[in-house]
Amino acid sequence: KSGVRALLKIALEKGALISKFLNDAQLCEICRNKAEKISKIPGDHEGQKQTAAFMSAAGLMKKEQAAEVIKKNGSDGISSYLLFYTLKELADTDEISALNILKKYSLGMLQRGATTFWEDYDPLWAKNTGSITDLPKDGQDDIHGDRGDYCYKGFRHSLCHGWASGAVPFLMEQVAGIHIIGAGCRKIEIKPKMGNLKFIKASYPTPYGVLELSIENKNGRPKISFSAPD
């Protein structure tokens, strides 16, 4: 319930901004009042990392407190569906921990032959399994056929699923720090969160061409060079 309320508060606040832009003062006030009411309802993340992330994003929980919930036991309990939002909130206070969780979570899939994002994944599934491109050897489990959870058990589990691709926007928006701040991508701000990375290279498509970005970590400070379309 707390996670759903947090999402509703975020939606109402965005609704207030849109209403203000459209000069609808009445609807703007309704959205603001409803969002304020939600702020007064006590909430509990109940140890759920995704719930803590949404409560943090909605201003219903301090970012530092949410970070402690998300960091607990590393990549355990991370949702493929909500990976971006969870890591984004963690990176606001602890870039290195966010990167470490991403590495462990996504690397497990890559080491098992993934070329696309899986519908669901738990790092514990990798134990005693081989690549998805090979038939299991004697004594091995099949990470596709023998693993899964909820309604994703066995071969019903998709190995090419868009909702699990949150690693991509996280790397682009948070790690490389590429933020669109002008309508139509006319203006871009670059504010990387490198953590303990030594360098970053990224290519970002825009309506005017591809932005090429290179960032070096110089004693904790990013040195940014780029090639932007005309």
Locations of regions flagged by a protein language model:
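Catalytic cores of carbohydrate-active enzymes
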Residues: 3-142
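Non-catalytic C-terminal accessory modules of carbohydrate-active enzymes
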Residues: 32-33, 99-230
